[in-house]
Design a protein with these regions (language model features):
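Alpha-helical transmembrane segments in inner-membrane proteins
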Residues: 1-335, 363, 370, 419
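Cysteine-centered motifs
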Residues: 336-339, 347, 373, 381, ...
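Short, low-complexity, intrinsically disordered N-terminal modules
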Residues: 338-339, 389, 412
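Conserved acid/base catalytic micro-environments in cytosolic active-site loops
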Residues: 340-341, 402
Length: 421
């Protein structure tokens, strides 16, 4: 995709985010009042403008920041684990924050100082991620994934036990309220507390956009391309965990933003993480702002929790993803309709090469799918034209998937040799 088009997409999403922020600060019990926002910004010390400055503006800024952080973290997790169902809390970040938050709420420590709850939740999230990295960091991405799932289950049991045995019913209710995720009561102090880790974590992920493009193809291909796979994976996971921990610390657990938004971006604009990550940040902020806006106005005068709205929207989307994946697996010969690469790939129609959704970003690929036969371990190429090498390299494992796709478009064919075919 041309850089000019990248810029147009990001500018459009930025405009949408600004409009959503204006709507978030302008809509209230008295309807849409954009003039009130301008008045409040021009005279912030006026007591008449306290509602906008102290309540609506912090809530809007928190929604934009947390939505962006969750979406970027989700996109990074899906790339590292090569799993479309990966989300920011998969490494135990959310559960670690939740355990500490619930303990502080039930014990009464959270009531002593408003800042103790987000600080404690942030520390708990980082401790959980550290455990996952220490236990599973030396293994593959699948090992980290399994350790994260086990830790989530263990911490979830602790949370359930603490809430079930809470002496004060009101404390138990407050803990459940926090677990569902909400933006009510957020202040400028909360923003100042988490702004730095959120921004640092997001930048840390975006710096590795090119490496994520290669990790999506496979760790073997990334390694042959000169990427230090283990180091890159650990840095990206820590950066994603950092920005997630900061967001969860002040809002509670808001589900599905980190799962849904990256998928929407990939479906619409492709899988190049140089675009996916910033676009996910902008669309994630916009999406959470709209979800919070819906939570405030759908059931007036009662306000729903923001996490409830995101779950109501995200759960059906997850079902659509599952149905679509099952349909693709059941398609004849694994052939992907509409995939231009598969149509030019001689292996696909002949031997039924499986077509996967883990698309590799490439300027000439218009579909959302790709043939994975060139990147499966053990498959060897006959064609030196595909590898762009001399005859001496025929029969060596495929590497450099971008060069391979270029050759596919130039030659119109590609032949593979595999012992099982």
């Amino acid at each position: 995709m041309p850089k000019r088009k990248y810029g147009m997409i990001l500018v459009s999403l930025s405009v949408a985010l600004v409009l959503a922020m204006i709507a978030g600060t302008s809509l209230g019990a008295l309807g849409f009042q954009p003039g009130l926002v301008l008045q409040a910004l021009s005279a912030p010390s006026d007591p008449a403008n306290a509602l906008v400055i102290s309540v609506r503006l912090p809530r809007t800024l928190v929604a934009a920041m947390v939505g962006a952080s969750l979406a970027v973290a989700g996109a990074a997790m899906q790339a590292v684990f090569r799993n479309p169902l990966a989300e920011p809390g998969i490494t135990g970040v959310s559960s670690g924050a939740a355990v500490v938050a619930v303990l502080m709420i039930v014990s009464g420590l959270a009531a002593a100082n408003p800042l103790m709850l987000p600080i404690g939740a942030f520390i708990g999230a980082l401790l959980a991620v550290s455990i996952v990295q220490i236990v599973g960091g030396r293994g593959s991405s699948h090992t980290i994934l399994l350790v994260g799932i086990a830790l989530n289950a263990f911490l979830g049991a602790i949370i359930a036990a603490v809430i079930a045995n809470a002496v004060n019913a009101e404390d138990a209710r407050s803990a459940m309220f926090w677990l569902n995720g909400d933006l009510t009561g957020r202040t400028l102090s909360d923003i100042a507390l988490v702004a730095v880790p959120i921004v640092v974590g997001m930048i840390g992920v975006m710096v590795y956009a090119r490496e994520l493009n290669l990790l999506v193809v496979g760790e073997a291909i990334a390694h042959t391309s000169g990427i230090r796979v283990e180091r890159t994976r650990q840095i990206v996971l820590f950066a994603a965990a950092l920005t997630t921990a900061a967001g969860v610390a002040i809002t509670g657990i808001i589900s599905f933003v980190g799962l849904v938004v990256p998928h929407v971006v990939r479906l619409v604009w492709g899988s190049d993480h140089r675009l996916v990550l910033p676009a996910s940040a902008l669309l994630g902020g916009t999406g959470l702002l709209l979800a919070d806006l819906a939570a405030r106005i759908i059931w007036q005068p009662v306000a729903l929790q923001t996490g409830t709205v995101t779950a109501l929207v995200g759960a059906p989307f997850l079902l659509v993803l599952v149905i679509r994946a099952v349909r693709d697996q059941q398609s004849p010969q694994g052939r992907c309709r509409g995939c231009r690469v598969a149509q030019k790939h001689a292996c696909a129609p002949v031997v039924g090469v499986r077509i996967d959704h883990a698309a590799v970003p490439h300027s000439h690929v218009r579909g959302r799918h790709m043939a994975i036969c060139p990147v499966v371990d053990g498959i060897r190429c006959r064609s030196s034209r595909v590898l762009g090498a001399s005859d001496a390299f025929q029969g060596t494992p495929c590497s450099g998937f971008g060069d391979l796709l270029d050759a596919l478009h130039r030659t119109g064919h590609h032949r593979c040799q595999h012992p099982s075919w």
